[in-house]
Amino acid sequence: MTPLLELKDIRRSYPAGDEQVEVLKGISLDIYAGEMVAIVGASGSGKSTLMNILGCLDKATSGTYRVAGQDVATLDADALAQLRREHFGFIFQRYHLLSHLTAEQNVEVPAVYAGLERKQRLLRAQELLQRLGLEDRTEYYPAQLSGGQQQRVSIARALMNGGQVILADEPTGALDSHSGEEVMAILHQLRDRGHTVIIVTHDPQVAAQAERVIEIRDGEIVRNPPAVEKVNATGGTEPVVNTASGWRQFVSGFNEALTMAWRALAANKMRTLLTMLGIIIGIASVVSIVVVGDAAKQMVLADIRSIGTNTIDVYPGNDFGDDDPQYQQALKYDDLIAIQKQPWVASATPAVSQNLRLRYNNVDVAASANGVSGDYFNVYGMTFSEGNTFNQEQLNGRAQVVVLDSNTRRQLFPHKADVVGEVILVGNMPARVIGVAEEKQSMFGSSKVLRVWLPYSTMSGRVMGQSWLNSITVRVKEGFDSAEAEQQLTRLLSLRHGKKDFFTWNMDGVLKTVEKTTRTLQLFLTLVAVISLVVGGIGVMNIMLVSVTERTREIGIRMAVGARASDVLQQFLIEAVLVCLVGGALGITLSLLIAFTLQLFLPGWEIGFSPLALLLAFLCSTVTGILFGWLPARNAARLDPVDALARE
């Protein structure tokens, strides 16, 4: 008969300083399917080390160990995990149940890593618990169960994937005599069902219940009676089959990892909340700065547009402040007509201006009188609260009409409801009021100077007596590039004048400069916010590292029941990402509250959350979770199962 478990000259040594301490010294042992074997020895005899090697939790330093003819030395970590999952079931002295899972969920764990579908897994767990007399305790947590009940849950977990070989480490060591007898009775039943049962104990009375007692002392076997031949030994109950395959198994495994991660986080609510706090603040900072910064930028740009965008102003001279007399008369009415004929010009309005006195009855104030065309008000986005602008007939006839700004109206007519039709003196010229223009309110503030507008023909012919213009404002048609239009305008006037005796001021250039400045400022503030997100990510990493340390025994349990290193890595990585995603969602909620609060105090601001901003926030959360969760997850996946199980 071929042995199920075959050990030949197994040695295991551990480093102790500069020396190697040999714990197992040439162990040779055969265990057959269906046997009930007890390995007995005093503390320090090497029996636990031998059990770890038998259960593929540890590897021998030298020698050969075969499981059903398969040499385990040739297997990698994942293959060893599969071997544990499909052939071995562990029963520990301290039960090693996961405290945040119910009895039913604890029993299901091995089948999760085997890829068994959820419905099958649930039915099998319930069947095993019912068989062991725990059908009314399936939803109980370990802390709610007695020691004997916890050990029975541990036995059910060992049987979940079939449990061909049951490895029981001091199964009665933490139990009272009655519970211990119940556990031994269950082990005898498992032997009768065809399971191979290996009991590791220091208690001779427990060992005596086995068919074969192997004694180990100082790393050597001192007693090894021959095996009792079993008839029709099957080597265990039917293996669990019908596992999902391909992408379904991957999706199912991911869902289970997500569920387990959520349960682990829910079991430590305060720690989870503290872990999330840094992410909440970081995401809220990033989203708030991006959204509020964008609202501020749009408001600034709107203010700039309110004073005229897509416009080019032409002034005489070389630059602002140039009062050289030879340039004062550079711009003529013929230049205006030539500009208006260009295909890229939507409108062109001249301007002549002079500071004059305005009088009405006994009110006498100083104001800036500006001669313009009717298009001037459209160019600068001005509206009329009363009346209207002057028409072409009034321009051609040098009509004595005037448009007031709202401040001038208030100074001259503080008590009149309607001022259209009233006559005032502009300088020494009487003029009839035909409208009141409202300038757009700007965050840059309003001018304190009172302003009135007359037809440019009236201003130059009747008031100032000059034949030249102080400036020309050109509005570029939609679809034409403003910079290209500025070049063509410069070329046109230079050809007409034979020299460049003027300069231009492009408002689009100002707009682009402001856009660049606000973009740079927003980027800087975003980087500051990203730093807070990075700090939050480091906090996640620190807490997850602590979590790995605290949950070392849990990791060992999962590996013992068949979890691969990749399964452990996936679970802890999902936990980190889950923390960051939930923290990100709370951070977005916080940023929404901040935005709505700001909007209450800043009614002119239009704060909106674009889908892109929300997507970027969740992307940041996910990336943060992956980046800062990878190191703790990797540390967890690299743990040695024997060392992990030994830690408390």
Swiss-Prot record:
Function: Part of the tripartite efflux system MacAB-TolC. MacB is a non-canonical ABC transporter that contains transmembrane domains (TMD), which form a pore in the inner membrane, and an ATP-binding domain (NBD), which is responsible for energy generation. Confers resistance against macrolides.
Any one Gene Ontology cellular component term annotated for this protein: plasma membrane
Membrane topology, as annotated: Multi-pass membrane protein
Domain ABC transporter per the UniProt entry, residue ranges: 5-243
SUPFAM superfamilies assigned: P-loop containing nucleoside triphosphate hydrolases
Keywords annotated in UniProt: Antibiotic resistance, ATP-binding, Cell inner membrane, Cell membrane, Membrane, Nucleotide-binding, Translocase, Transmembrane, Transmembrane helix, Transport
Pfam families hit by this protein: ABC_tran, FtsX, MacB_PCD
CDD domains xrefs: ABC_MJ0796_LolCDE_FtsE
InterPro entries attached to this UniProt entry: AAA+_ATPase, ABC3_permease_C, ABC_transporter-like_ATP-bd, ABC_transporter-like_CS, MacB-like_ATP-bd, MacB_PCD, Macrolide_Exporter_MacB, P-loop_NTPase
Main localization (coarse): membrane
Biological process according to GO: response to antibiotic
Keyword Nucleotide-binding: yes
Main EC class the enzyme belongs to: translocase
Protein name per its UniProtKB record: Macrolide export ATP-binding/permease protein MacB
Family to which this protein belongs: Belongs to the ABC transporter superfamily. Macrolide exporter (TC 3.A.1.122) family.
Annotated transmembrane regions: 273-293, 523-543, 576-596, 611-631
NCBIfam families from the UniProt entry: PRK10535.1
Gene name linked to the record: macB
The protein's assembly and partners: Homodimer. Part of the tripartite efflux system MacAB-TolC, which is composed of an inner membrane transporter, MacB, a periplasmic membrane fusion protein, MacA, and an outer membrane component, TolC. The complex forms a large protein conduit and can translocate molecules across both the inner and outer membranes. Interacts with MacA.
